[in-house]
Amino acid sequence: MTKKILILSGGISKERLISLDTGKQVAKELIKNGYKVLISEPDKNLSKNITSFKPDVIFNALHGQFGEDGYIQAILETKKIPYTHSGVIASSIAMDKEISKKIFIKNKILTPKYIKFNHKKNKLNIIKLIEKNLKFPVVVKPINEGSSVHVYICDKTNILKNLKVLKSYNEILIEEFIPGREIQVAIMNNKSLGAIELEPRRKFYDYEAKYNSSAKTKHLIPVDLSKNNLAKITGIARAAHKIIGCKGVTRSDFKFFNGKFYLLEINTQPGMTKLSLVPEIAKHKGISFIKLIEWILKDASINR
């Protein structure tokens, strides 16, 4: 019997276009391999689409707010249909950069030092606040956003300008900038799928570097690490995946500097576009795109 897959994509976040691309790529591969597919927005028609299509599994291809922060997962739980990726609690924790960093620190996982800045509450001179707790340069980013949306590397000369850009966000995370190598690790079924190193031409692996082929970010795989260091970084990624309570596939983002691995964040809904890293890591391991998708579907469940 042909399986019916409803793909959730689009949404209202700043990562809408990436989500649409992920949904399109997954749908194309599933249709090519004989699956019945319906792509749906997470809007007022979702319940009607679920009722009429009667999917066997819901593939969550949403990114960003409402898609990977626990909200849509809570709605999907009420539908009693197996869905992919992490559940309500893990999604909400991973999306909140401050909460996830607190959990990393509690579990002795190295992560850059940080402070939280609230536009309404913090009346102190921000430069003095940073100099007291951190050191320049710093990375400034929204606490609840993905795909490096509105992430800036700042020094004293541009910190105020970039904070002004972020004024629409109540809370901002300001963390020490860690130089060094950018390495990403994919975890699947609580096991390491592999690692990939990025050499962006830009200052760091930002939104443009991730999704614009003209940015010409170099993808290096296999990663040039000693056996011991590779085991170390994949072990940290596995630990973070487990501690947060993630399911399915995740991608952990690291900086490697002075022999230390710094975990920046864990992504519960890694992209599945042509430029996405998890499919590339899987391919290097001999896992085709359709096999990766089918594994994600097979792992789907309720009460995640």
UniProtKB/Swiss-Prot annotation:
<keyword id="KW-0961">Cell wall biogenesis/degradation</keyword>
<feature type="binding site">
    <location>
        <position position="265"/>
    </location>
    <ligand>
        <name>Mg(2+) 2</name>
    </ligand>
</feature>
<dbReference type="GO" id="GO:0071555">
    <property type="term" value="P:cell wall organization"/>
</dbReference>
<comment type="similarity">
    <text>Belongs to the D-alanine--D-alanine ligase family.</text>
</comment>
<dbReference type="Pfam" id="PF07478">
    <property type="entry name" value="Dala_Dala_lig_C"/>
</dbReference>
<feature type="binding site">
    <location>
        <position position="253"/>
    </location>
    <ligand>
        <name>Mg(2+) 1</name>
    </ligand>
</feature>
<feature type="domain" description="ATP-grasp">
    <location>
        <begin position="101"/>
        <end position="298"/>
    </location>
</feature>
<keyword id="KW-0436">Ligase</keyword>
<dbReference type="InterPro" id="IPR011095">
    <property type="entry name" value="Dala_Dala_lig_C"/>
</dbReference>
<dbReference type="Pfam" id="PF01820">
    <property type="entry name" value="Dala_Dala_lig_N"/>
</dbReference>
<dbReference type="InterPro" id="IPR013815">
    <property type="entry name" value="ATP_grasp_subdomain_1"/>
</dbReference>
<dbReference type="InterPro" id="IPR011761">
    <property type="entry name" value="ATP-grasp"/>
</dbReference>
<dbReference type="GO" id="GO:0009252">
    <property type="term" value="P:peptidoglycan biosynthetic process"/>
</dbReference>
<keyword id="KW-0479">Metal-binding</keyword>
<dbReference type="InterPro" id="IPR011127">
    <property type="entry name" value="Dala_Dala_lig_N"/>
</dbReference>
<dbReference type="GO" id="GO:0008716">
    <property type="term" value="F:D-alanine-D-alanine ligase activity"/>
</dbReference>
<keyword id="KW-0133">Cell shape</keyword>
<keyword id="KW-0460">Magnesium</keyword>
<dbReference type="InterPro" id="IPR000291">
    <property type="entry name" value="D-Ala_lig_Van_CS"/>
</dbReference>
<keyword id="KW-0464">Manganese</keyword>
<comment type="pathway">
    <text>Cell wall biogenesis; peptidoglycan biosynthesis.</text>
</comment>
<keyword id="KW-0963">Cytoplasm</keyword>
<feature type="binding site">
    <location>
        <position position="265"/>
    </location>
    <ligand>
        <name>Mg(2+) 1</name>
    </ligand>
</feature>
<dbReference type="InterPro" id="IPR005905">
    <property type="entry name" value="D_ala_D_ala"/>
</dbReference>
<dbReference type="GO" id="GO:0008360">
    <property type="term" value="P:regulation of cell shape"/>
</dbReference>
<keyword id="KW-0067">ATP-binding</keyword>
<comment type="function">
    <text>Cell wall formation.</text>
</comment>
<feature type="binding site">
    <location>
        <position position="267"/>
    </location>
    <ligand>
        <name>Mg(2+) 2</name>
    </ligand>
</feature>
<dbReference type="InterPro" id="IPR016185">
    <property type="entry name" value="PreATP-grasp_dom_sf"/>
</dbReference>
<dbReference type="GO" id="GO:0046872">
    <property type="term" value="F:metal ion binding"/>
</dbReference>
<keyword id="KW-0547">Nucleotide-binding</keyword>
<keyword id="KW-0573">Peptidoglycan synthesis</keyword>
<feature type="binding site">
    <location>
        <begin position="131"/>
        <end position="184"/>
    </location>
    <ligand>
        <name>ATP</name>
    </ligand>
</feature>
<dbReference type="GO" id="GO:0005737">
    <property type="term" value="C:cytoplasm"/>
</dbReference>
<dbReference type="GO" id="GO:0005524">
    <property type="term" value="F:ATP binding"/>
</dbReference>
<protein>
    <recommendedName>
        <fullName>D-alanine--D-alanine ligase</fullName>
        <ecNumber>6.3.2.4</ecNumber>
    </recommendedName>
</protein>
